[in-house]
Amino acid sequence: MIEWIIRRSVANRFLVLMGALFLSIWGTWTIINTPVDALPDLSDVQVIIKTSYPGQAPQIVENQVTYPLTTTMLSVPGAKTVRGFSQFGDSYVYVIFEDGTDPYWARSRVLEYLNQVQGKLPAGVSAELGPDATGVGWIYEYALVDRSGKHDLADLRSLQDWFLKYELKTIPDVAEVASVGGVVKEYQVVIDPQRLAQYGISLAEVKSALDASNQEAGGSSIELAEAEYMVRASGYLQTLDDFNHIVLKASENGVPVYLRDVAKVQVGPEMRRGIAELNGEGEVAGGVVILRSGKNAREVIAAVKDKLETLKSSLPEGVEIVTTYDRSQLIDRAIDNLSGKLLEEFIVVAVVCALFLWHVRSALVAIISLPLGLCIAFIVMHFQGLNANIMSLGGIAIAVGAMVDAAIVMIENAHKRLEEWQHQHPDATLDNKTRWQVITDASVEVGPALFISLLIITLSFIPIFTLEGQEGRLFGPLAFTKTYAMAGAALLAIVVIPILMGYWIRGKIPPESSNPLNRFLIRVYHPLLLKVLHWPKTTLLVAALSVLTVLWPXNKVGGEFLPQINEGDLLYMPSTLPGISAAEAASMLQKTDKLIMSVPEVARVFGKTGKAETATDSAPLEMVETTIQLKPQDQWRPGMTMDKIIEELDNTVRLPGLANLWVPPIRNRIDMLSTGIKSPIGIKVSGTVLADIDTMAEQIEEVARTVPGVASALAERLEGGRYINVEINREKAARYGMTVADVQLFVTSAVGGAMVGETVEGIARYPINLRYPQSWRDSPQALRQLPILTPMKQQITLADVADVKVSTGPSMLKTENARPTSWIYIDARDRDMVSVVHDLQKAIAEKVQLKPGTSVAFSGQFELLERANHKLKLMVPMTLMIIFVLLYLAFRRVGEALLIISSVPFALVGGIWLLWWMGFHLSVATGTGFIALAGVAAEFGVVMLMYLRHAIEAEPSLNNPQTFSEQKLDEALYHGAVLRVRPKAMTVAVIIAGLLPILWGTGAGSEVMSRIAAPMIGGMITAPLLSLFIIPAAYKLMWLHRHRVRK
């Protein structure tokens, strides 16, 4: 089959070259137009349900809103995890779906089940779906700053809410623009309880009057002078004077009682659950641009920047927009870095080819397969919808060396056969027809084995395709693009390369002996191989012992899920205890931001505590998320690295009650979505009794702090909230003609503040709040004395119908699959994650006694690593079996297939030793490198064995038991090994040379790519060295055994 394809391609070379030209043009177009991003979208398919229940405590929100929603969503088809968050005034439910679920199908199913549960929610409470965005949709953030002092926080927030937000939402593929920080303007109707009692007016009557005085109505239309006039009765509240003139009732003598008689109307700030701060200089308002799921981040960011630039002229004087996070910077750095590495690889591979072949046109034949293979890979990427990112380009990068292997072997074999033809016909001139015939025969001779070897490299990535969840989404693009590139190289090797050889390998072909590099290789290899063939069993014993040397470094190498990717920015997410006030949170935020700005490498600090106005942010007030923009690396102090910056920040920011955590922004948001945990290691304690969960979480926190490598550990306190409980006495309330609902309505309105509508001021809408003065509700004693007007117009106090007590309770409730859960956040440093977790598990098992009904589960990146390891343990052996079958089909002998498979362990030797030497941990990235190494090592074995077989087949006496001799066998093995050392050395050299730029790279994304390249380079140093000696030695023993059997 392969022979037929080669011969038909050469026969129809014009059509093949036209097809190659078409592919190159099409591929160039796709390369230019392929969307780019920094990383693949690693987030799970999620649908967020946000429900506002203003003024309600977390326990009430959990009981009345979150619990009905989470229990219903557990039945949604395809849902694998349902997380609930109940906090003050808001409920968030995250429905996480299985991989491969269509996001819009998921939204429709959630909406369907949401309609079923809507009737179980409290009156007036309505759940809504969050934006169709992923967990990493926060692509651009900005702050509004007024350095002139002309505009306060309320003005800045209004500018964001009613101008910038709507302008930016018009940009295609922007799912949402969330406001954060600043102050929302609010009309506050502050009731004087004494004046209210004096006039005998209840709170309910005030609410009714406010509602009735803030409406507009239409009166149809009338005709005047042959024209239509629409009738409108204006009634919106627009000024404080409008509020003051609201009539509440008329006295007995007909004098109206106005709102101003019983209340003070003022403009003030709405209760805040989110605060933003810039550079430690003070509070600001800001916005977050959220990308629609699956769209092009860089294009959208560019459109956002252009839009903001055009809007600058429309901003009030003194107001400026400051960019506080811009993912396009990371995208550009990552793509530029990987593109540069690919170019370096191309150049290095070209130099290696030229040095070995010692013929420029022959080297060009091998080199041209690289851009053609790249075009094929990008064309398939385009149809699959893959974008260009660190991982997809990385797949091509690790394939570059192997892509030219087949071309190299074919070219070298063509050189050899042309040299032999000249030797056999010293007086003849090689005409065009004969040259094409020699080159075609040379291609057919090695083509099938090379095609099988490239197929083996392609199939070696099957385990990567089977990875699930986040690890599958991260390494899937790498596996796809490497597969496409290798498949393209295999196709080119049997279709295009023979044709290019026929056109370009012309004129005087320098003999192999004229190349000093080749002479050096033969001079070194020759005596060593003679010794190996003289003592084949000793050679195999030494090789087996060399494999055992990996036991020492393997025990020293730690484990992790993925290395920390340097995104160029940092996220400061300290863990704090709950119950902090808004004023204290703002003060703490400014202090930490100011300390962070003191580090010279920091360019800008955008601090956020609490949440932005979006369903994608469920942060409670005590959760700090500070985005740190760093200066370009060339502006850092000499010797500074990201690790050193984090260490200096950690030593600088030291405030009581804060457990520091420094994480990359994208990585953190991915982890929080997939596992719910913001730290690399997390422990989830689940149960039914909140007190038991709290006790266990605190015990685990104490134990965790004693484990080596744990930098910080903090358990959430479920019972850390402070409550003032109003316990209604039903009997006493009944004596005054009041129900429990009447008292609750009074507490909600007078203490919590009732939202009684909003003003309409152009396109702006501002809330109206009704409540008692601060002095009447600032202590339990003041609450007890709150006056109540009963339905029978009696004046009583709250203490007459209820007991007011101070207690503790949950500040925020979290559930996973409807079970209450507490999370312990653990940050590990100076030690690998796997070792820390193993010690943690041991310490918890020994020192923490589980209470009945509770359970402990490790989460975070460790959970993802365990899942990936489990999958690879199943799939790697299966893949080796598939490779073995392919080898058997190629050589038709079990022994020869086993011989090549046995070379794979020798590749591990160099890979593990290089990992240890470079200080890398075992991870999914290094595992990917080892899997790629297995395919390349098998390919080298195929090439080696192919030449040995050809040499033996060229000596007919070896197949005859009567003429067989060990001396002739050694001579054949010598010819197959030493005289064909050039293509083997080239195969190794181009792979190592192609990977070195990746290993030594330091730019964005190099943390992952270097760990993929390290085991491949280490393995390609030891595997070929051992295989150059082991395969001839083992093959000799195999033939000697075969000869004894024949005799």
Swiss-Prot record:
Keywords from the UniProt entry: Cell inner membrane, Cell membrane, Copper, Copper transport, Ion transport, Membrane, Transmembrane, Transmembrane helix, Transport
Protein name per UniProt: Cation efflux system protein CusA
Pfam families: ACR_tran
Protein's gene: cusA
NCBIfam families attached to this UniProt entry: 2A0601
GO BP term (any one): copper ion transport
GO cellular component, one term: plasma membrane
GO molecular function, one term: xenobiotic transmembrane transporter activity
Membrane topology type: Multi-pass membrane protein
Subunit (UniProt): The cus efflux system is composed of CusA, CusB, CusC and CusF.
Source organism per UniProt: Escherichia coli O6:H1 (strain CFT073 / ATCC 700928 / UPEC)
Superkingdom assignment: Bacteria
Primary localization: membrane
Signal peptide boundaries: none
TM regions (residue ranges): 14-34, 338-358, 363-383, 390-410, 446-466, 485-505, 532-552, 871-891, 898-918, 928-948, 985-1005, 1012-1032
Role this protein plays: Part of a cation efflux system that mediates resistance to copper and silver.
Family: Belongs to the resistance-nodulation-cell division (RND) (TC 2.A.6) family.
Induction: Transcriptionally regulated by CusR in response to copper and silver ions.
Subcellular localization, as worded in the UniProt entry: Cell inner membrane
